[in-house]
Design a protein with these regions (language model features):
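Sec-dependent signal peptide recognition
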Residues: 1-8
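N-terminal leader/targeting segments and the immediate start of mature chains
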Residues: 11-51, 55, 105, 243
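A short, amphipathic edge element
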Residues: 22-24, 90-104, 162-164, 222-225
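Generic beta-strand hydrophobic packing signal
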Residues: 39, 95-98, 103, 154, ...
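Extended beta-sheet lipid-handling architectures
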Residues: 40-43, 54-58, 66, 71-73, ...
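A mature extracytoplasmic/lumenal domain signature
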Residues: 43-47, 65-67, 73-77, 116-120, ...
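An acidic-aromatic
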Residues: 50-113
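Gly/Pro-enriched, hydrophobic low-complexity segments
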Residues: 109-239
Length: 244
């Protein structure tokens, strides 16, 4: 009986220690994100999706903490929202049962992976029935650089089937701010629910654009995002974001 009690205490200690580590990783990553009070940047988007054509597009994007965004663009264009203008805390709040995994692929000790299940209510997807709600529970693997405390990649999957991937490249701007300079977003679609989710995650700047997958065929799409001409912590005012 005493051995069983000690064993239970041991596993409780491990569980509490892991939760403390997870909270530390999220807190440090969010702290790094919060150092950027506001910024202005030129964003270039190139989209490669079957049956959908859009020329390379340029946006002038303004951002101010916590969630003020202003986008200037001429003509039609789309801009993916996933992870671009949301804090790490907000993103991790959409996950449950978060666990820590080491990055065994490249044996890099300066990177860790936090993996969790998506909270379906956060997706705001209409499910046709309760069975779909129970079976459509994606897992998200978030790779964190523990030296610079930034998110390097996000992979969303159901078991081993990948739904979409985000990869970010960074460099120091003004020798001070570690900012993304390139993002690549890959979509793998073979389900109407997933296609609907993607459409929820695409922000139409002008017009109403939908990616259709009526035949449930596998669609692989790529969105390439490049960031240039950063102006960071200029002291933008809130009133600027409400001007038309």
């Amino acid at each position: 009986m005493i051995k069983l009690f000690i064993l239970i205490l041991f596993f409780q200690f491990i569980f509490m220690n892991e939760n403390e580590q997870i909270n530390k990783f999220i807190k440090n990553t969010n702290h790094q994100y919060k150092k950027i009070k506001d910024y202005e940047v030129d964003i270039y988007v190139k989209m490669e999706v079957p049956a959908f054509r859009m020329p390379k597009k340029k946006y002038k994007v303004y951002f101010m903490q916590p969630d003020l965004i202003k986008i200037n663009s001429k003509g039609f264009g789309i801009l993916p929202k996933t992870g671009l203008f949301t804090s790490p805390t907000d993103n991790f709040d959409n996950l449950s049962n978060i666990k820590i995994y080491s990055n065994s692929e490249n044996n890099n000790h300066d990177e860790i992976i936090l993996s969790g299940k998506i909270i379906l209510d956060s997706l705001k997807i209409e499910m046709p029935n309760e069975y779909s709600r129970l079976t459509f529970i994606p897992t998200v693997d978030v790779q964190i650089d523990t030296i610079n405390w930034v998110i390097k990649s996000v992979i969303t999957r159901i078991d081993t089937l990948k739904l979409f991937e985000i990869y970010n490249k960074y460099k120091f701007i003004n020798n001070k701010y570690y900012m993304p300079i390139e993002s690549e977003i890959k979509y793998f679609l073979k389900d109407k629910k997933v296609a609907n989710w993607l459409n929820k995650d695409i922000n139409s700047v002008i017009g109403d654009t939908k990616i259709n997958n009526k035949n449930n065929e596998m669609i692989e799409g790529n969105i390439f995002v490049r960031y240039d001409n950063y102006k960071i912590n200029q002291g933008l005012s809130k009133s600027f974001f409400y001007k038309k």
